């Protein structure tokens, strides 16, 4: 059992968020959350992984949105808010479409968490309960990109681990 716990914890740390976008502050422009698997093994996200969003400074999050599919070892996985608009904006296909109003549809001042198979926060962007407007995690009309030297998941937000581009 201890071995299983250690292995599970190691696998959880291999997947983390690398980018969140709010292009043109519009859900029509293909908002998305990008995940990365830094591990040596593929990860089946349908085993309980999810994304969750806190909006407008609310202390209570929206419902967790289940992830599906598999993220390859060393690979990326894109969760978008609208597959057609994502394709029109970037010329690419997202891996999973959550739809408008869900965890991949942030207007740049929301807080987003990657939840592991046990429902705990594996990686956190922002501070739950805090409206991100005017803070170090606001990416309205822009994007938040994980810094190159920030290569592990963290359940606690640290602004120094991210490069933020916004209209303010």
PLM region descriptions:
Residues 12-143, 147-149:
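Activation on beta-sandwich/Ig-like modules and their edge loops
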Residues 136-137, 145-168:
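Extracellular low-complexity, O-glycosylation-prone Ser/Thr/Pro/Gly-rich "stalks"
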